[in-house]
Amino acid sequence: MTVLKIHIILFFALAINQAAAQKAKPYVSEVWVSDLGNGMYKNPVLYSDYSDPDVIRVGDDYFMTASSFNEIPGLPILHSKDMINWKLVNYAVTDLIPKEHFEKPKRGDGVWAPSIRFHNNEYYIYWGDPDFGIYMVKTKDPFGKWEEPILVMEGKGLIDSCPFWDEDGQAYLVHGWAGSRAGVKSILTINKMNPEGTKVLDKGIHVFDGHDANPTVEGPKMYKRNGYYYIFAPAGGVATGWQLALRSKNIYGPYEEKIVLEKGSTKINGPHQGAWVDTQNGEDWFYHFQDVDAGGRIVHLQPMKWEKDWPVIGIDTNKNKVGEPVMTFKKPNVGKSYPIETPAESDEFNDDKIGLQWQWSANENIVWSAKLPGKDYLRLFSIKIPDGEKNLWNVPNLLTQKFPAPNFVATTKVKLFPEDVKEGKIAGLLVMGMDYQSLVITNKPDGFYLQLRKAQKADKDGEEKILNEIKLKSNVVYLKANVNEPNGICTFSYSENGKKFENIGETFQAKPGKWIGAKIGIYSVSDSKVSRGGYADFDFFRITKN
């Protein structure tokens, strides 16, 4: 073999290895990174709407799940090695059941406040659907396929469930109640389960009533330590509440109660509902959410310690035995350091599948999109808006993701192909919530137009209106949304060459959805007068700094 051939082989081998290394390189957000790179971290660890988070450690691995409501795929699975740097790696459900029920957007319904546990070498997730009951899914591999959901307990208003297996093998399920369905809330109930955790065996026993001092107590998580049964539970409401700890030597009580985390003198409103996790080296930590309105319920991590068999979460700054949340702190000791990594946001649509950050508003129909191997774009078909709808609230084929930070820019490039239809195809960029605004390209008999559209009180059937309209030179346009503090102020702009962008319309105040934060994404639909044909190709979707 000649020296030249050897050099050529080495060159290509190096190129292949570099390409593989680049592909495997952790994604790092431009707009929010919790790891400060100096052994410290800042809260929130996730500035995204992973509401009602629950976290477990299995060996050296940490896994998180969160509420996903009607968004599909549902039950996100996030993975971390150091409790700070998280990657979205999977979902536990690909369809909500009953499948026919969730073919249409049931906003705010579906998956409420899940709990993840590791038992007998299997991973379990339990959640309450307020209309149908408590479900469970399990797997031996959290990165792989999860089994089909099992209805563990049927009933209305059953929410926020958490399993517990005692040392004697007995299995229990603690849960809360949704007043909107059950007619009562602010109580916690324990049911006995079969050892497999697939069904409850009794009507349950109420173990805590929060009506007197802890209204809206919900989201219970059960643990055992030093002979005490603990129920960690939030109370006081989503945006303004506090964290309770309940303890008893008997699983059915009576339970002592103590507030263990509150806002105090900090700016962190409603620091509650989450997970106690210990590290390999014996440290204790607590994850919880903070409701930030348009940004959703973002995830914080607090240091935790035990005093006289009570948890103290955060820092007890005023010595009242109640912790307050920290904004920065030393990273957990997990034995070694790991690279900075964040959940993916941008998507070049170069892979065979779209990124895991994307979710539909209902159970996915395969005809909504096509991501063909070897194609560097995502094709969204122009699906007809359901008859009688005045806005996008009940449109299932919206492809969106969570707000990734308080300040960011989202940019996409779209090409509209109406086929033989002369008007009524619509595709573009969307900031979705109970009020929403979109910047779209559409077609008319005389060409293509840019439109800024808006609906207020979309959840109350508010009519979508066209605010601005500009004639375009072609079927290609670049669309941008600039999102800023405070609370998601959005400015839309467009470009026909991808270089010079021009603002259009006035600023828009992003609004949360039903139990979720605002979402940003893309969509392609047909006006209700147009039944078929047409599609839009999206070349990329990028999240960058303002």
Regions found by a protein language model. Give the residues of each.
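Carbohydrate-active catalytic/glycan-binding domains of CAZyme proteins
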Residues: 21-546
